[in-house]
Amino acid sequence: MISAAVIEALKEIVPADKVLLQEPMKLHTTFRIGGPADCLVYLENEEQLCKIQKYLRLVDVPYTVIGNGSNLLVSDQGYAGIVLVVGKHMSRIEVRDCYLEAEAGALMSQVAKAAKEHGLTGLEFAAGIPGTIGGGAVMNAGAYGGEMSQVVTTVTVVNRLSLIHISEP
């Protein structure tokens, strides 16, 4: 169970309507399974992610970060902790010359579509993958002979210590 003080602290970082208590995870997974998370928080930007991670580490509250919830199995007992959702508010896709930049919450299918619309190749394999680009990068998602490691050149990472760094695979 998450204390009222922790919930109030979260509401100081994100709008109160973005903090949901006892939220059924089946509403947030593509398999439509999973019991309630003690708390689920919709993130709107990288700054909120950093602040919340730092705070939760300080108060020693367990948390996990998800995107679209694709291929995610959650117990019927739910999740004892806080689920941070990197979703549609963190889904910007931008094309620059021959490069495409996408935030973690962008759907892989939308990133593949943007690439196609701008004459960029290499992401065709991602068109049918239901996950987010963030999750795809973490697990090296792939299909039909293509995978993320073949197309990713740079990744900006917010690690568990809330340190932002850029890495090149």
What residue ranges belong to the model's regions?
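Anion-binding (especially nucleotide phosphate/pyrophosphate-binding) glycine-rich loop
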Residues: I2-I133
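Hydrophobic alpha-helical segments and helix pairs
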Residues: K116-H118, G122-S162
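Residue-level detector of conserved catalytic or cofactor/ligand-binding positions
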Residues: L161-P169
